[in-house]
Each structure stands twice: as C-alpha cells, then as structure tokens.
From Swiss-Prot:
GO terms for molecular function: aminopeptidase activity; epoxide hydrolase activity; leukotriene-A4 hydrolase activity; metalloaminopeptidase activity; tripeptide aminopeptidase activity; zinc ion binding. Pfam families: Leuk-A4-hydro_C (PF09127), Peptidase_M1 (PF01433), Peptidase_M1_N (PF17900). This is Leukotriene A-4 hydrolase. GO terms for biological process: leukotriene biosynthetic process; leukotriene metabolic process; peptide catabolic process; proteolysis; response to peptide hormone; response to zinc ion; type I pneumocyte differentiation. One of its GO terms (cellular component) is cytosol. The modification Phosphoserine is found at S416. Pathway: Lipid metabolism; leukotriene B4 biosynthesis.
Length: 611
C-alpha cells in the first residue's frame, strides 16, 4: 500500500521508522496536575542508514533521552499550534533497515495538556477525591508522551502507573496487577498490558475513586460508586451486543470488554479505548434507550481498532463502518424496522449538519483534506452519517444486508492490524464484488467521496416507525392557534422514547415555532420533566430557537452540567444567537471554561467567537 502523508503529524512517517512497543512508567501528581515518567519506545527503522528520527510532542517538558544507557542529543522544534512541537532525536549509531532501538525519554506533561482533564473533588460525584481522565483521539497522545502520533503506526504497550493508594488507575489494556509503590507508601502502582498493536490515539488512562460491577463474562462496568448500580442496569445488554458483533465481524481479539462511565465533562458520547470503552453519563436514561452508543463502541473493536484509518482524512472508514455495524446490532436485537428507523434518523442528522456548515463547505466531504486543519475543528457527524449512507446505499445496490455483511467481515479479516485509506477500501470492494463491477461502476464515486454537500443518491428507508413521528410533527408545524386545543398527552401514548426523540428532531428542523405552540407543547407533554438527555437536548433547542425566555436557565444548566460536545456546543450556539440570552451565554462560558474539558472549552470559545 503506497505511502500517504499524515499532515496532522510532525513525526517521522511510517516509511522511515515504526514504533513497535511502548513501555510507560509514570506517576500521577494531582497537586501539580502533571504526569511524570519515562516512555521507552521500541522503534524499528524502515530504511538503511537511519541517523535521526522525529517524534510528536505537545506542551511536554523533556528531561533527557537515553539510548543504550547513554544520554543522546535531541532538539525540540518551535510549537506549531495544535500540532505541537517536533522532537528530533539523534541516534548514536546509524540503524540499518529493520534494526530496532529502544529510546527512553524522561518527560513531564503540562497542567494545560490538551489530552487530560484534571477534576477537583468538587467536580466528582463522591466529592472526596480528585479524578483524571485522558482523551487522545485524534491527535492529543503527543500531549501525554512523545510518540509517532499518527494512526498509520501501531504498537503494543505495557505500563506501570503510580497513583495515590486510595484511587484506582485503569488503562486501555488488560489489568496486570497492583502493588504498593516501593518509593512511597502512600501510593500504589497499577500495571497494564496491551498485547494487540494499536494506534496511539487509543492509549487511555483514568484515575479516580472507581468501583466496578460485573455485568457479563468479559465485562465489568466501572464508575464512581454513586453511578455503579445505575450503570450496571443501563448497560446490561452489553454481552448480547458483543455476541452479535462477533457474529458480524469475527472473533473479539481484545480479551476484556469493560465499560467506564466518566464524570459529566467527558466530551464525547463514547470513546472506543480497547478493553475499556469510555462513555458519557448522559447515556444513563434509566431505560436502556441510549444503548446504541454501546453498540457503536463495541463495533469499533473491529472497524477502527483492528482496521484503522491511515490518516484522519479517511476518518469515515472508522466511523461509517462502525455506525453500519452498530445499526445491524440494534437491528438484530430490536428488528429490521428499528434499523431502518435509526438509519433514516441518521439521514436527517446528515441534512442538519450540512445545513449548519453550508452545502459547499469542505468539511461536508466524506474524504477531507486536513492539511493545516485541526481534526477537532473539522469533527462532525459527516464521517458517521455520510459514511453510513454510502454503505447503506451499497448494501441496497449489491444485494441486501447479508451480502454486504459478507463484504464487511471479509474487509475486517483482510485488513486487521493494518491502517487503510479510502483507495484501499474501494479496491477491496471491487475485488470482493468482482462479479458486480457493472453495478459498482454505476456509483458516482467522485460525488460520494470527494464532493461537498448531500450525497448524490438517497438510499431507500422503511418508514414504518418514522411515520408516527412525522405525522405528529406535521400537526404541530401546521397548527393554527385555534388548533392548539386538539393536542393532548394521548398523542404520545404509542410512541417509544426513540420516536419521541425523532418527533422533536422533526419539529426542530422546522424551528422556530410560534411561542404559543411551544408553551402549549410544554403544557400538554411536560417535556421539561424528561431527563432523557437526547430528548431534553432537542426540546431545549426548540425552546431557545423559538425564543422562549423561560427556557434560558434550563438550557444554560444543561450546557454546563454536562460537557458532551454534541449537546453543549449547539446549546451554547443557540443561546448566543438569541438576543435575550447572548450576553448570559458568553458570561456563563467564561465563568465555566476553567473547569471545562480543554477541547470543549476551545471549541465553545470558537463557536461563541470569544478568546
């Protein structure tokens, strides 16, 4: 497979050298908000006469670099903003092709590391102990340790992490024991081993007052004790989802599949860290209705973690295939009509995102060009939903779900433990369906892959479960003031929480509604009392876009009490666009930003045009 440049990394590319293994020894210092330690990187030269190599770093302090017991020279280049600073290391002897060297780097992270959020005890559920978690995707691993911070390089890792003894450390690896810290009796060392090679964006660490409960033969759910029972209930379907995923993708190679429920500031719905999926507590709806996120993270164990996008330009390969698998898992559990219902909801989400960006915006392309673009800034639902739409369209073109799932399983088998580009994927698609090349040649590949805006074709969707949502939303959107008395709580009696959410998504596409309509909707449906995060989010957006002043404190509360960017960013944007709440939104952001996740704080700041 030809070399493609990773414009998001300043390190030597995989064609020059490859990190094969990391041994991390570090200590977590809550008082100084720093990780201090050594990263021993086993690097294999990919060419003859290699005399130096470059690693990614970001806001790191480097103490020294040691090779074969000798300190060696290194230079830290100028900072290049979100990309960090290249670190060039001189090798004491030139390496020949395939020769390995162990480079031991002593480093310390910055309190402002973009990869880490340090929480005070007050920011936790238990209020007694501090908490730390990492989020490396896409390019923040370099803000924890020097590395080739590119998904084109995969490595195994082992780690020893020293933490205060009343706390627990977990990583994206198999737990490998714990022992008192010989250097400090008030601390404990936790050991970890990840034997499957992974891109370094999947390295993850959490430290806190964590407890666990077993919910399946290979699954513990971890959280602070205040959430552990609720989480065990919410995610009880995990093992049945894993079994379906293995049926669709092949054997689960990672051993353990644990779940970690994080504090509310965690910026994503979930993060597929191997052996330990991280999830937002906003999934704790009480009725398992948001468990599709678990199906999504489980699916990444194949698409993303085994078969990985070679650069972030091809992120859709990770996310499109993962959404495709996720919806098949939910289809197996809840029926094919349910799969189509979520697929169609995803098309609506795609329309919304394209409308927000503008239909000619380069970030609405499936394959993006991230040269001089921070992947966090480009991040959106496009790679998920445009990617899914392409695969769903191909499923229908090529003979249905069973046929296309056969392709997906073969794709995973072919490219496991590798990193791939869109061209690799497309070549394999053509090879797998060599008897259907005529059909494949009907696809407008250029439009699907490289053009902005909506895809050239909309797939076919079963609308059975969506129809009720559309019908009720139409009634509201077309209602005159004198019609408002015709609505009652009976309207909702046959709708699932998924359908209620879709109803609000449909109405939101037509926002603003007259204020009288919104007040009447609250009067008959009492949406303010609903705690399901997805439903509450769409309801509050509808209220603010329709200029209901009474909703301002509720929207501000939701935007700040949790930090999942899917919710926080649009809520802040809507509040800033409403004259009655603009100043309050900016003020609230400025008051809260010091205790927000660093990436969330940066992006909300951009959204609000402050800083």
């Amino acid at each position: 497979m030809p070399e493609v440049a990773d414009t998001c990394s300043l390190a030597s590319p995989a064609s020059v050298c490859r990190t094969q293994h990391l041994h991390l020894r570090c200590s977590v210092d809550f008082a100084r908000r720093a990780l201090t330690g050594t990263a021993a990187l086993t690097v294999q030269s990919q060419e003859d006469n290699l005399r130096s190599l470059t690693l990614d770093t970001k806001d790191l302090t480097i103490e020294k670099v040691v090779i074969n017991g000798q300190e060696v020279k290194y230079t830290l280049g100028e900072s290049q903003g979100y990309k960090g600073s290249p670190m060039e290391i001189s090798l004491p002897i030139a390496l020949s092709k395939n020769q390995e060297v162990v480079i031991e780097i002593s480093f310390e992270t910055s309190p402002k590391s973009s990869a880490l959020q340090w929480l005070t005890p007050e920011q936790t559920s238990g209020k007694q102990h501090p908490y730390l978690f990492s989020q490396c995707q896409a390019i923040h691993c370099r803000a924890i340790l020097p590395c080739q911070d590119t998904p084109s390089v995969k490595l195994t890792y082992t780690a020893e992490v020293s933490v205060p003894k009343e706390l627990v450390a977990l990583m994206s690896a198999i737990r490998d024991g714990e022992a008192p810290d010989p250097e400090d009796p008030s601390r404990k060392i936790y050991r970890f081993n990840q034997r499957v090679p992974i891109p370094c964006y999947l390295i993850a660490l959490v430290v806190g007052a964590l407890e666990s409960r077993q919910i399946g033969p290979r699954t513990l759910v971890w959280s602070e004790k205040e959430q552990v029972e609720k989480s065990a209930y919410e995610f009880s379907e995990t093992e049945s989802m894993l079994k379906i995923a293995e049926d669709l993708g092949g054997p689960y190679v990672w051993g353990q599949y644990d779940l970690l429920v994080l504090p509310p500031s965690f910026p994503y719905g979930g993060m597929e860290n191997p052996c330990l999926t991280f999830v937002t507590p906003t999934l704790l709806a009480g009725d398992k209705s948001l468990s599709n996120v678990i199906a999504h993270e489980i699916s990444h164990s194949w698409t993303g973690n085994l078969v990985t996008n070679k650069t972030w330009d091809h992120f859709w390969l990770n996310e499109g295939h993962t959404v495709y698998l996720e919806r098949h898992i939910c289809g197996r559990l809840f029926g094919e009509k349910f799969r189509h219902f979520h697929a169609l909801g995803g098309w609506g989400e795609l329309q919304n995102t394209i409308k927000t960006f503008g239909e000619s915006h380069p970030f609405t392309k499936l394959v993006v060009d991230l040269k001089d673009v921070d992947p966090d800034v480009a991040y959106s639902s496009i790679p998920y939903e445009k990617g899914f739409a392409l695969l769903f369209y191909l499923e229908q073109l090529l003979g249905g779900p069973e046929v296309f799932l056969g392709f997906l399983k073969a794709y995973v088998e072919k490219f496991s433990y590798q990193s791939v580009t869109t061209d690799d994927w497309k070549s394999f698609l053509y090879a797998h369906f060599k008897d259907k090349v005529d059909l494949l040649n009907q696809v407008d590949w250029n439009a699907w892959l490289y053009a902005p805006g909506l895809p050239p074709v909309k797939p076919n969707y079963d609308v059975t479960l969506t129809n009720a949502c559309i019908a009720l939303s139409q009634r509201w959107v077309t209602a005159k003031e004198e019609d408002l008395n015709s609505f009652s709580i009976e309207d909702l009696k046959d709708l699932s929480s998924h359908q209620l959410n879709e109803f609000l998504a449909q109405v939101l596409q037509k926002a603003p509604l007259p204020l009288g309509h919104i007040k009447r909707m609250q009067e008959v449906y009492n949406f303010n009392a609903i705690n399901n995060s997805e439903i509450r989010f769409r309801w509050l957006r509808l209220c603010i876009q329709s200029k209901w002043e009474e909703a301002i404190p509720l929207a501000l509360k939701m935007a700040t009490e949790q930090g999942r960017m899917k919710f926080t960013r649009p809520l802040f944007k809507d509040l800033a666009a409403f004259d009655k709440s603009h100043d309050q939104a900016v003020r609230t952001y400025q008051e809260h930003k010091a205790c927000m996740h660093p990436v969330t704080a940066m992006l909300v700041g951009k959204d609000l045009k402050v800083d």
